[in-house]
From Swiss-Prot:
Pathway of action: tRNA modification; tRNA-queuosine biosynthesis
Membrane spanning residue stretches: none
Taxonomic lineage of the native organism: Bacteria, Bacillati, Bacillota, Clostridia, Eubacteriales
The keyword Cytoplasm belongs to this UniProt entry's keyword annotation: yes
UniProt GO molecular function: S-adenosylmethionine:tRNA ribosyltransferase-isomerase activity
Organism: Clostridium perfringens (strain 13 / Type A)
NCBIfam families found in the cross-reference section: PRK00147.1, queA
One GO location term (cellular component): cytoplasm
Catalyzed reactions: 7-aminomethyl-7-carbaguanosine(34) in tRNA + S-adenosyl-L-methionine = epoxyqueuosine(34) in tRNA + adenine + L-methionine + 2 H(+)
Main localization category: cytoplasm
Protein name per its UniProtKB record: S-adenosylmethionine:tRNA ribosyltransferase-isomerase
Subcellular location: Cytoplasm
Length: 341
């Protein structure tokens, strides 16, 4: 299977540069995975497609304002760090730009010295391991000084940091938002619960590997980045009861899907579990837990379009994406959504 099999022509003007004023006013393409039939709706209409007893699985990760712009303590030279993951305590793995300035032992300051970073070592792929020094609580300092790490295809400045968070975000640790969840409002979630639909939560901290292009020709040769996940006992039991009752487990986003499929066993059950996953889902994969999926429109030739093709069928997805381009749907993080039913 070739990576080029997942290519489609995408005009740049269809890449959404900002979120819509109202989260659930985005468009919703409903794709029937069995027939390939397409309906065009608004996201709020998702309510009509959810049944009593179904369980919606949401990723409650919260995006860290992980982009820090500072200067070299000695010379005042500019530096930009993008935090990737906490290693332990105040040590973090990050990307440094320009990397040549971030030599081992160099000290950088942010926010007029409120935060300092010392480069401790150079890791894999040139990533830096840095250690922070600060007064107070790190998360509060980062909230004050950090900027949202918006994807590389978004060029507009984000006016409101919260628009790159889901309304149910809770567990800090992501370098990018689980964007399928951005369409939900508090009111819509209440309506969903009132209809008798269960809501389960898990955590997967989204890494920057999400935006890395696939650099091989053959899909089988691609190696996924790994990301931390957690599913607690209460939510695992809710998902298992749903499967036992013959109801649907509907994943919100590829991150929720990958977590559920990592934990799921051959009998279609999940359990409380934490760890790191590098699961790569592409056509040919048989889903164990996920029945349906709410997702955004993804980049051509990305691992995410491969995942949705595994669930809905490659021909159905490529046809749906070409239809989305023709109908001028908005693409990527701040774009419109798809429900694979």
């Amino acid at each position: 299977m070739k990576v080029s099999d997942f290519y489609f022509e995408l005009p740049e003007e269809l890449i959404a540069q900002y979120p819509l004023e109202k989260r659930d006013s985005s468009r919703l393409m409903v794709l029937d995975k069995k027939t390939g039939e397409i309906e065009h709706r608004k996201f709020h209409d998702i309510l009509e497609y959810l049944n009593e007893g179904d369980t919606l699985v949401l990723n409650n990760t919260r995006v860290l304002p992980a982009r820090l712009i500072g200067e070299k303590e000695e010379t005042g030279g500019k530096i930009e760090f993008l935090l990737l993951k906490r290693i332990e305590g105040d040590k973090w793995e990050c990307l440094a730009k320009p990397g040549r300035k971030a030599k081992v032992g160099t000290v950088f300051t942010f926010g007029e010295g409120k935060l300092k970073a010392i480069v401790r070592e150079i890791g894999e792929e040139g990533n830096r391991i840095i250690e922070f020094k600060y007064d107070g609580i790190f998360e509060q300092v980062l909230d004050e000084l950090g900027q949202m790490p918006l994807p590389p295809y978004i060029h507009e400045k984000l006016e409101d940091k919260e628009r790159y968070q889901t309304v149910y975000s809770k567990e800090k640790g992501s370098a990018a938002a689980p964007t399928a969840g951005l369409h939900f409002t508090e009111e819509l979630l209440k309506e969903i619960k009132d209809k008798g639909v269960n809501i389960a939560y898990l955590t997967l901290h989204v890494g920057l590997g999400t935006f890395r292009p696939v650099k091989v020709d053959d899909v089988n040769n691609h190696v996924m980045h790994s990301e931390y996940y957690h599913l607690d006992k209460e939510n695992a039991e809710l998902i298992n009861k749903t499967k036992e009752a013959g109801k649907r487990v509907i994943a919100v986003g590829t991150t929720s899907s990958r977590t559920l499929e990592t934990i799921g066993d051959e009998n279609g059950r999940v359990r409380e579990q934490s760890g790191w996953t590098d699961i790569f889902i592409y056509p040919g994969y048989k889903f164990k837990i996920v029945d349906n999926l709410i997702t955004n429109f993804h980049l051509p030739e990305s691992t995410l379009i491969m995942l949705v093709s595994a669930l809905a069928g490659q021909d159905n997805i490529m046809n749906a994406y070409n239809t989305a381009v023709k109908e001028k749907y908005r693409f990527f993080s701040f774009g419109d959504s798809m429900f694979i039913k």
